[in-house]
Amino acid sequence: ITFRGALIEYIESEASIWELLAYVQMRALNIGTGGADHHEASIRDAIHRRASREDRATIKHEARAMRLRLERTHAARGRNVDIKFGAGGLLDVYFVVRYLLLLDLRAIAPEAMTTSARLDAFAAAGMLSAEDHAALHEGHGFLSTLDHSLRLAFGRSSRLPRANHPVM
């Protein structure tokens, strides 16, 4: 049995929904042995088969529970605003994308790897309304730009500095 075979077997028989939420982000690396696209496609198919055995409500519940757990354990405390882990932050957009991927991993092309490209593909496939697409796309764009700017100014932090911070 190969590593890929063992992984596929695990995904199809034992993987929990929270693991599938992580696995949908998996990408194959082509390090000279060839066949990376084939390996990635077979793993995506296994994720699709496994997720299709769950009903939408269960996937939604599990995705939300994991998102809230990350917020509780990582979000800024007190008066700080955390644009990644806090409510309304980047992870909200990422979890919507992962939830939609689990609903139908085959609805979008594997080449749609960025969050923006995936949101566009979900809208084109009718999985997101125009209103939801616009809100998610604009919010993601704004928060991504803000995150990049904060990293340039303050280093690796997803937390907005307080208004009375000396740097401000």
Protein language model features and the residues they cover:
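A nucleotide- and high-energy phosphate-metabolite-utilizing enzyme signature
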Residues: 1-168
